[in-house]
């Protein structure tokens, strides 16, 4: 990890070096302009676009702006014309004081790509200040014994202008004793000296009043005056003297007010009043007089107002010692202000972008500069931001930095970054400044809507009301704003036969699904379709999910009786021999239910019977069987009503009516099996032989049964009355008799049997076997069969 970190650091250093190299080449171009102070706001300075070789459109598109070193807006760049204009009146004397030339430094910053141009604006001085004297009156005491040619220092005037507009000369009002001399000065300042041109006589003139005039070099020149009061004293031949001409002290800028700075002491060899010395500042500026004070008796210099290294680094104080005779001496006190780390770094934001798109990399977030008013290590700074942020600082030139995104961001992971720019100096103790920037990551449509489930299963009970809400689908989008607004729709079904548009609809805003019409389980048990979720981004993104609708069965179908038919025609009659044993299968009620599940579970029960207890119905399969042995006392004709009920809630039911005819000596006939399929006819010879043998035995058995029945009926016809059955007048309908012995119609042979009366013979007529069907037989055919039955058996069936 340490090696990797070192490599990353080395890469960053190389990148910063290349950026600084490019910027240093781009920043070597500079422009120089000048303007007179006090020029009106909005005055033209220069056409910056022309001087920099840039088009006006380029200035606007690249967001050109002017940034000064002290972060003050002295100039304004008109992006429409490219003109550089004054944004405020400039006072050269306030900006630069006595410094000449007075040059203000600016940077022209262009973006896309980032480029800097240096601009220097020289503020030219105008003669807007007159020379002024700090003292309205200058008192000079001169002994009458002073020799001709003696010089006397006087307070100089102050002129805030510089150059030719500054103080140039002094004149004295006409008199017979003095003239003004301007000596050469190492600091090139003009100091007036009063020179004695003619000896004074205390007795003749003890006091002189002269006017000292200071004249500058402006056009027209300006001047200032002060009164010079000269008092003639008696002879004093020794002037005060200082041990050294220059005193140097170092004072930290945080020295408390009233603190002692230094003590300056002079000696005078005279005695008495001429030896008494008083100390004063002379040629002292207003800053010196405000900052320091001197004890006129002891010569102690004390601090009067706070020191600030960042404003003034040193003070040169001229101190004059004057004795009682008017003689004086001078020395210089040099006070050097020591810097302490009392100024935290300053952060100035030139431009800032608080919202950046998430898919943009290396986007400029902020351009800022840092400044520390201290000096040395106290003024050296380190600029940094937090670790583990996808941003980095890129130094440009001097103390300018750019805050740039390191890579493309992901708003869904983090939508906001709080970046703290920390600037720390290297002083003791270290001071730091923090500047917080909140960067909002604007959304880009990079996430498709996602359904909460890949598939949905909805349940809908049939016979629903139209427009019924059957369920909902839901999708979420990790984006924000319009990019996260989801619209739902139905996708074309994969099955072209599915009329999806007439079955369901979806609310485009919330994903609610509605059934458009009532559904029938018996027609449609289930269907599936796809729904889509599309956001409103550009380009729009979408996803889909599968919806499966299961139609739940409702108990809306009553049982339907397949057999016996209940179509309003003449009912079928089942023949039961009186010799039948208990449990004899009379018939089987077959019913179906169009519903499903427990709604289609059918149960059977005997609802009504002509003779209760004679017959019973099996509840689960509908088989009607005899419950006991039949006797001669039992009626020959019986009517049974069987109730068929489903297991729904509430249950639905149907009834089947059966007619049963008790017959003496009747037994189940035997008929050959139906012809086999063509494929079975090709069985081997052994199978054929077995079938032929079985058919022969069956025929013999059938013949015996028929003979037995015929004999039996002939005997009874004379001894007993003819049995009656409630067969309606008209044709006697055919019926189906189950002879399989298993009670299952699907595995039985069924024969159409017709019974007729009116004949003197008691016999049955069997017709050909038929395939089960539930169509009503032809009435004419039934009538013919009934007539044949009557003729054959001689029965009178009513």
From Swiss-Prot:
Cadherin domain sequence ranges: 35-133, 138-242, 247-347, 352-451, 456-561, 568-671
SMART domains: CA
InterPro entries documented for this protein: Cadherin-like_dom (IPR002126), Cadherin-like_sf (IPR015919), Cadherin_C (IPR032455), Cadherin_CS (IPR020894), Cadherin_N (IPR013164), Protocadherin/Cadherin-CA (IPR050174)
Protein keywords: Calcium, Cell adhesion, Cell membrane, Disulfide bond, Glycoprotein, Membrane, Repeat, Signal, Transmembrane, Transmembrane helix
Residues linked to a glycan: 169, 359, 418, 436, 567
Signal peptide: 1-26
GO CC aspect terms: plasma membrane
A molecular function (GO) term: calcium ion binding
Residue intervals on the Extracellular side: 27-686
Topological domains, Cytoplasmic: 712-798
Subcellular location, record wording: Cell membrane
Recorded topology in the membrane: Single-pass type I membrane protein
Coiled coil regions in record: none
Cysteine-cysteine disulfides: 96-102
Pfam families, sorted: Cadherin (PF00028), Cadherin_2 (PF08266), Cadherin_C_2 (PF16492)
GO biological process, one term: nervous system development
Protein role: Potential calcium-dependent cell-adhesion protein. May be involved in the establishment and maintenance of specific neuronal connections in the brain.
Name this polypeptide is given: Protocadherin beta-14
The species this protein was found in: Pan troglodytes
The encoding gene: PCDHB14
């Amino acid at each position: 990890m340490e090696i990797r970190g070192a490599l990353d650091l080395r890469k960053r250093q190389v990148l910063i070096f290349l950026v600084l190299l490019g910027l240093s080449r781009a920043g070597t171009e500079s422009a120089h302009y000048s303007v007179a102070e006090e020029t009106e706001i909005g005055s033209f300075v220069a056409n910056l676009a022309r001087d920099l070789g840039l088009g006006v459109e380029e200035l606007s598109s690249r967001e050109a702006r002017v940034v000064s070193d002290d972060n003050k807006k002295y100039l304004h760049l008109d992006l429409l014309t490219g003109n550089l204009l004054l944004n405020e009146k400039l006072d050269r004397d306030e900006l630069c004081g006595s410094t000449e030339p007075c040059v203000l430094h600016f940077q022209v910053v262009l973006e896309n790509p980032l480029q800097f141009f240096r601009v220097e604006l020289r503020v030219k001085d105008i003669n807007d200040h007159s020379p002024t004297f700090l003292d309205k009156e200058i008192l000079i005491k001169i002994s009458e014994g002073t020799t001709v040619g003696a010089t006397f220092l006087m307070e100089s005037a102050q002129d805030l202008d510089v150059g030719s507009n500054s103080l140039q000369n002094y004149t004295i009002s006409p008199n017979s004793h003095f003239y003004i001399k301007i000596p050469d000065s190492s600091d090139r300042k003009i100091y007036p000296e009063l020179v004695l041109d003619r000896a004074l006589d205390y007795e003749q003139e003890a006091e002189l009043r002269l006017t000292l005039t200071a004249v500058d070099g402006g056009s027209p020149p300006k001047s200032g005056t002060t009164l010079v009061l000269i008092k003639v004293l008696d002879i004093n031949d020794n002037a005060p003297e200082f041990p050294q001409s220059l005193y140097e002290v170092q004072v930290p800028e945080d020295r408390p007010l009233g603190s002692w700075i230094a003590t300056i002491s002079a000696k005078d060899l005279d005695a008495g009043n001429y030896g008494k010395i008083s100390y004063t500042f002379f040629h002292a500026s207003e800053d010196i007089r405000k900052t320091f004070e001197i004890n006129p008796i002891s010569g102690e210099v004390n601090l009067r107002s706070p020191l600030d290294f960042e404003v003034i680094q040193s003070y040169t104080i001229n101190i004059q010692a004057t004795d009682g005779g008017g003689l004086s001496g001078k020395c210089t006190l040099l006070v050097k202000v020591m810097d302490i780390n009392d100024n935290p770094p300053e952060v100035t934001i030139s431009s800032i972008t608080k919202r950046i798109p998430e898919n943009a990399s290396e986007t400029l977030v902020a351009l800022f500069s840092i400044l520390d008013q201290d000096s040395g290590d106290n003024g050296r700074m380190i600029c940094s931001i937090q670790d583990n942020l996808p941003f980095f600082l890129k130094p440009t030139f001097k103390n300018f930095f750019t805050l740039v995104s390191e890579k493309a961001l992901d708003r869904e992971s983090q939508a906001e970054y709080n970046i703290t720019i920390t600037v720390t100096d290297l002083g003791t103790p270290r001071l730091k400044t923090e500047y917080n920037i909140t960067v909002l990551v604007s959304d880009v449509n990079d996430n498709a809507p996602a359904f909460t489930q890949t598939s949905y299963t909805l349940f809908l009970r049939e016979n629903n009301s139209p427009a019924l809400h059957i369920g909902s689908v839901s999708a979420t989008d990790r984006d924000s704003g319009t990019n996260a607004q989801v619209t739902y729709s139905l996708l074309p079904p994969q099955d072209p036969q599915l009329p999806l548009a007439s079955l369901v609809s979806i609310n485009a805003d919330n994903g609610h699904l509605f059934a458009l019409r009532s559904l029938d389980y018996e027609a449609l048990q289930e269907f599936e379709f796809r729904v889509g979720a599309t956001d409103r981004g550009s380009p729009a993104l979408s996803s889909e999910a599968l919806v499966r609708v299961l139609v739940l069965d409702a108990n809306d179908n009553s049982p339907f009786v397949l057999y016996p038919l209940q179509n309003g025609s003449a009912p079928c009659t089942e023949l039961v021999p009186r010799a039948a044993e208990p449990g004899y299968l009379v018939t089987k009620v077959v019913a179906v239910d169009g519903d499903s599940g427990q709604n289609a579970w059918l149960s059977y029960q005997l609802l009504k019977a002509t003779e209760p207890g004679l017959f019973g119905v099996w509840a689960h399969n509908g088989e009607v069987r005899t419950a006991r042995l039949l006797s001669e006392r039992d009626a020959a004709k019986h009517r049974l009503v069987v109730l068929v009920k489903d297991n729904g809630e509430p249950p639905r039911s149907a009834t089947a009516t059966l007619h049963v005819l008790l017959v003496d000596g009747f037994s189940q006939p035997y008929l050959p099996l139906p012809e086999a399929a063509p494929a079975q006819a090709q069985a081997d010879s052994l199978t054929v032989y077995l079938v032929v043998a079985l058919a022969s035995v069956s025929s013999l058995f059938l013949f015996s049964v028929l003979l037995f029945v015929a004999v039996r009926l002939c005997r009874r016809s004379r001894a007993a009355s003819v049995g009656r059955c409630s067969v309606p007048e008209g044709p006697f309908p055919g019926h189906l008799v189950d002879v399989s012995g298993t009670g299952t119609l699907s595995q039985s042979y069924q024969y159409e049997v017709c019974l007729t009366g009116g004949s003197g013979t008691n016999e049955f007529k069997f017709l050909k076997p038929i395939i089960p069907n539930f169509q009503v037989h032809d009435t004419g055919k039934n009538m013919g069969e009934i007539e044949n039955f009557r003729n054959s058996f001689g029965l009178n069936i009513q």
